[in-house]
């Protein structure tokens, strides 16, 4: 009897271990190729993509059930490094339900409004605590501190190429080939009434030369520059839409080599007068108009004109009221080609100076100009590329760039002084930043 009890005790002690081993055997899974390859169904590289800035005060993380934040500076009732909850999905949907404006499933499409409400106080960007949300049927603004829904605008059905301005809260969009504007109070205005073959408010020139859209709001959002592309003279090319259950014919206009190309003009629509002025650029035949940018006061607009041979570019300034050419600031030529890819960027602290990007020395670099078209200095140089202008440090008067200076296999962030052109590496020097 004692022997039996002894073995029973051993068996009882072993049961938990056997049970745990059995559970582990059920949980453990051999990884498959699909599990280990990026882009597979069960594996993806972690990306810090759901983040927004609340002015210079805090960084917000957009999530499914809530938006979290961390204070970046010491403020009223907060310390740098402290975490806080901006708003929950339950709170947001309650505000939406009260006005029957739809429902959110997550906050991934939320956007902070970082327009200064009182310019720049000290060195920090002061902004209102507003979140732009889209339910699919309505675009809404929520004051996340007061937990109040302060504004809404219906989303136009079948709209494409939407371009919303956070200052005026006007929305530019296209229906088929024409351009429309919905004002901040929900009024719909048709800006163009063109027939088939003429496209307005959409990307032109086959998305070359940095063009990726067709509308450009002025800084205050009361003027809208847009492309008008006449391609009625371009031969149609048949393509088959294979996404349909039964293949469908889709004719597109494509200028083959040596054949007639489309003609592009640039219009400026005034939301207050509801009138449109077209820039007097002359005959648009075999010319490209690219890299549109506004002067800070919106009294003039800048663009780069390029010939069809793509070896002669001109930076031109036009009057936004009359559409007349005010000045050709400078020209750039090359025996083979020039490739303007970026609009000029004005310095936040000086409306009379701007940064121009060019590959004139064989590598894409930054050049500082004044509004008279005079080259003040070359800000960056070397056998490497400036990939992006990311922003500015107003306090130190530096421009922040992404470049390949460390290695052509890497992208690193640098701070460049506009005073002496010295560069400082931000963060470590390894990897993609």
Where are these regions (language model features)?
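Positively charged n-region of N-terminal signal peptides that target proteins for export
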Residues: 1-7
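Beta-propeller folds
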Residues: 10, 24-433
